[in-house]
């Protein structure tokens, strides 16, 4: 008879413990009900990104000395640098520079180690395309000036949002 009573007591204790755990989880869920939604309607609204964000790489053709440091420090040997040696002036002349953003991991090593600062990270992150070959940017596409996200009219709705000010 005694083992039966202790069995009922253990069962009762386990039931109370389970109810307490369920109640704690439910209280956490209820604490989130009075918060504002976090969802951003992406094509129409955008968040302001950090100033350290690693977006599309901007390239300045005139500053590049074709030293290929960017290729050596890239973990996947991605930048393609074509150059020609000008023998009469003993310098390299850059012919072509391209980066395939379909393969790029945006580590920023090329930007950090460039001795002439001809590479810089922008805040552009929209690379959507139907053909992956369109992600291979040459020096003309890389030289295009980036559009500032702050000047975009869709940002203003997020800037005035109460959840950005409060949280």
Curated annotation (Swiss-Prot):
GO cellular component term of the entry, any: chloroplast thylakoid membrane
Catalytic activity from the UniProt record: a plastoquinone + NADH + (n+1) H(+)(in) = a plastoquinol + NAD(+) + n H(+)(out); a plastoquinone + NADPH + (n+1) H(+)(in) = a plastoquinol + NADP(+) + n H(+)(out)
Superkingdom, natural source: Eukaryota
GO biological process: photosynthesis, light reaction
InterPro entries membership: 4Fe4S_Fe-S-bd (IPR017896), 4Fe4S_Fe_S_CS (IPR017900), NADH_quinone_OxRdtase_chainI (IPR010226), NDHI (IPR004497)
Membrane-traversing stretches: none
Gene3D superfamilies: 3.30.70.3270
Cellular location(s): Plastid, Chloroplast thylakoid membrane
EC number: 7.1.1.-
Mode of membrane association: Peripheral membrane protein
Start and end residues of each 4Fe-4S ferredoxin-type domain: 55-84, 95-124
Keywords from the named record: 4Fe-4S, Chloroplast, Iron, Iron-sulfur, Membrane, Metal-binding, NAD, NADP, Plastid, Plastoquinone, Quinone, Repeat, Thylakoid, Translocase
Names of the cofactor(s): [4Fe-4S] cluster
Record's cofactor remark: Binds 2 [4Fe-4S] clusters per subunit.
An example Gene Ontology molecular-function term: quinone binding
Binding site for [4Fe-4S] cluster 2: 74, 104, 107, 110
Pfam families: Fer4 (PF00037)
Enzyme class: translocase
Stated name of the protein: NAD(P)H-quinone oxidoreductase subunit I, chloroplastic
């Amino acid at each position: 008879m005694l083992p039966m009573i202790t069995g009922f007591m253990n069962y009762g204790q386990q039931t109370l413990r389970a109810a307490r755990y369920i109640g704690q989880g439910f209280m956490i869920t209820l604490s989130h009900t009075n918060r504002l939604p976090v969802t951003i309607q992406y094509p129409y609204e955008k968040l302001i990104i950090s100033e350290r964000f690693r977006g599309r790489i901007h390239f300045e053709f005139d500053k590049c000395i074709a030293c290929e440091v960017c290729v050596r420090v890239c973990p996947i040997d991605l930048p393609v640098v074509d150059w020609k040696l000008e023998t009469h002036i003993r310098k390299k002349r850059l012919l072509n520079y391209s980066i395939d953003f379909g393969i790029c991991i945006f580590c920023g090593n090329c930007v950090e180690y460039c001795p002439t600062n001809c590479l810089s990270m922008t805040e552009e992150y929209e690379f959507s395309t139907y053909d992956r070959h369109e992600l291979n940017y040459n020096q003309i596409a890389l030289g295009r000036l980036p559009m500032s996200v702050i000047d975009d009219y869709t940002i203003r709705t997020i800037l005035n949002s109460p959840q950005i000010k409060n949280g």
